[in-house]
Swiss-Prot record:
Similarity comment: family membership: Belongs to the MnmG family. TrmFO subfamily.
Protein name: Methylenetetrahydrofolate--tRNA-(uracil-5-)-methyltransferase TrmFO
Keyword Transferase: yes
Example of a GO MF term: flavin adenine dinucleotide binding
Known catalytic reactions: uridine(54) in tRNA + (6R)-5,10-methylene-5,6,7,8-tetrahydrofolate + NADH + H(+) = 5-methyluridine(54) in tRNA + (6S)-5,6,7,8-tetrahydrofolate + NAD(+); uridine(54) in tRNA + (6R)-5,10-methylene-5,6,7,8-tetrahydrofolate + NADPH + H(+) = 5-methyluridine(54) in tRNA + (6S)-5,6,7,8-tetrahydrofolate + NADP(+)
Lineage: Bacteria, Bacillati, Bacillota, Bacilli, Lactobacillales
Broad class of the protein's primary localization: cytoplasm
UniProt keyword terms in alphabetical order: Cytoplasm, FAD, Flavoprotein, Methyltransferase, NAD, NADP, Transferase, tRNA processing
GO BP term (any one): tRNA methylation
Amino acid sequence: MVKNVTVIGGGLAGSEAAWQLAKRGIEVDLYEMRPKKNTPAHETANFAELVCTNSMRSNQLSNAVGLLKEEMRQLDSLIMKAADETAVPAGGALAVDRDKFSAVVTKTLKDLPNVHVHEEEITEIPKDGITIIATGPLTSDTLAEQIKEFCGTDSLHFFDAAAPIVAASSINRDIVYKKSRYDKGEAAYLNCPMTKEEFYNFYKNLVGAETATLHGFEDKNVFEGCMPIEVMAKRGEKTMLFGPLKPVGLEDPKTGKTPYAVVQLRQDNAASTMYNIVGFQTHLKYGEQKRVFSMIPGLENAKFVRYGKMHRNTYIASPEVLNANYEARKQTGLFFAGQMTGVEGYVESAGSGLVAGINAAREALGEETLFFPKSTALGSMANYITTTSAKHFQPMNASYALLPKLDYKVRNKQERHLEISKRALKDLEAFKEEKKLD
């Protein structure tokens, strides 16, 4: 019986998988090529580095990703523990201090006696033993080529982007105001109000701004959930008003009126010295970011701590390659996890690592691998990425659309979602008990 598992990749999925393996007594060899070899998006050597936003989205049980988080908490997720421990104010959402978050994950794993960390690049898929490949959408070229060959299909890709971060001390507090939309949760966001004239001047400059060159980039290959603000703007002058610049529920306390448009800033670290511009993922040249984003009221003298940037993300054709336990169909003992499987988002990525980690541990212990109930967020994601049409396969966030409908009617959408979440948690509890999952 093999009681050793190799995990390749120390991102969110690989870190969660390593934790799930280690807590079940498995000896884990965790390989991470950083800092010896870096990627276009990473900036540190820490595990579970957040390269895009610091938000893990909704924390509400009436939201699919909120349900996913709760399921993961029920299964003793390291990523959720670290996120809850390093949370910063974000209204009804869960946002974290990104540096503290990755530091907690890194220290936890490195302190475990049965997790052996190797700072080196893996260039081939191991043929023997049990392995989890969780190298993420920025997998090194050499290993990516091996994975492509193993899958027997062309790898798919999309382009992802990160939003700029500004120094809190450079924000004009005479203009911005603190408020969460509809006053949900604590007043966690700084809001930059725009008049109609200010909005259209900003819009005109944004669509005319110069973008950086990126090989192979096309607007159609942008993931909808992380679309660059300039791409969104080019879809129509009012598109942003129904997206990140939506003003509803954000009345300006100085005037008592709703602005024409509002740009929100979200706290990026626990010390509240940095804020990111919500929804402003971008591929503009750095000079253009400074010029155009300084037109936002309150950011006229903004100091940019980090400019937005874009990178290419690669993922595999999971419907042709994986079973819903995240194990490869043509090689027993080889699992894939994380964004490269086609789940999209920090929490979703970690969730896939959780399931892959549990299953790799069970295989190492000579137990049957598990297929989580389709009525749970974890099970519905695994089911989607392995059964959907390969021809039209695209990355997917957690969604109620993936979960079975209720067998009774609930008219109110929020209440209906809550009922689906309650059913999911009940089914997960029964599944845990039946399969003796701790």
